[in-house]
Structures are given as structure tokens and as C-alpha cells.
From Swiss-Prot:
Organism lineage string: Bacteria, Pseudomonadati, Chlamydiota, Chlamydiia, Chlamydiales
UniProt enzyme class: ligase
This protein's UniProt keywords: ATP-binding, Ligase, Nucleotide-binding, Protein biosynthesis
Catalytic activity: L-glutamyl-tRNA(Gln) + L-glutamine + ATP + H2O = L-glutaminyl-tRNA(Gln) + L-glutamate + ADP + phosphate + H(+); L-aspartyl-tRNA(Asn) + L-glutamine + ATP + H2O = L-asparaginyl-tRNA(Asn) + L-glutamate + ADP + phosphate + 2 H(+)
Gene: gatC
Statement: the UniProt record of this protein carries the keyword RNA-binding: no
Recorded family membership: Belongs to the GatC family.
Record protein name field: Glutamyl-tRNA(Gln) amidotransferase subunit C
Biological role: Allows the formation of correctly charged Asn-tRNA(Asn) or Gln-tRNA(Gln) through the transamidation of misacylated Asp-tRNA(Asn) or Glu-tRNA(Gln) in organisms which lack either or both of asparaginyl-tRNA or glutaminyl-tRNA synthetases. The reaction takes place in the presence of glutamine and ATP through an activated phospho-Asp-tRNA(Asn) or phospho-Glu-tRNA(Gln).
Organism: Chlamydia trachomatis serovar D (strain ATCC VR-885 / DSM 19411 / UW-3/Cx)
Amino acid sequence: MTESYVNKEEIISLAKNAALELEDAHVEEFVTSMNDVIALMQEVIAIDISDIILEATVHHFVGPEDLREDMVTSDFTQEEFLSNVPVSLGGLVKVPTVIK
């Protein structure tokens, strides 16, 4: 049996915080799956990487000096752009409400 890292109450709380509807019948499945994933992550964490040069595997910070200079271009007009959107209003793209 896999070690228990999370329990039923934590899965229910996590689903509630993520605004997910989780049926009671599936809670135990998620508990088992989550514990399996965490156990696998624990195995990966336990791997000895002391002989690996980490500097070679980490990307350096991308700063302004690494970015190209902005160039203002006009590839198409506002009307051409708006001709490809389903709904526009006052020269703007109208999108569905995503936050209640």
C-alpha cells in the first residue's frame, strides 16, 4: 500500500478551493491517485544528483538585454482585424464573461 500523504478531507477541500464539483464516489479515487503521484515525486526527490553539474541544466535569467528591440509595424488595419472576430463592439473585441 502506498503511504498516505493526503486524506479525503484534504481532497474535498482542494476541490472546493479550485471550484470543482467532485462527486463523493470519486473522492477515494482521487485520494489514491494523489497519494500515488506524491509517492512517485518522493522517489524522484530521493535520486542522488550530486554528480550532476546543475549550472548546465538551468536557464539564465532573461533580462531586457536578452530581448529584441520593439519595432512598431502595421500589418493590418483595425477593420481587417475586427473582420475575423465573432463579436465586436465600438471597435473592440467582445468576449464572453469569465468571472461571475
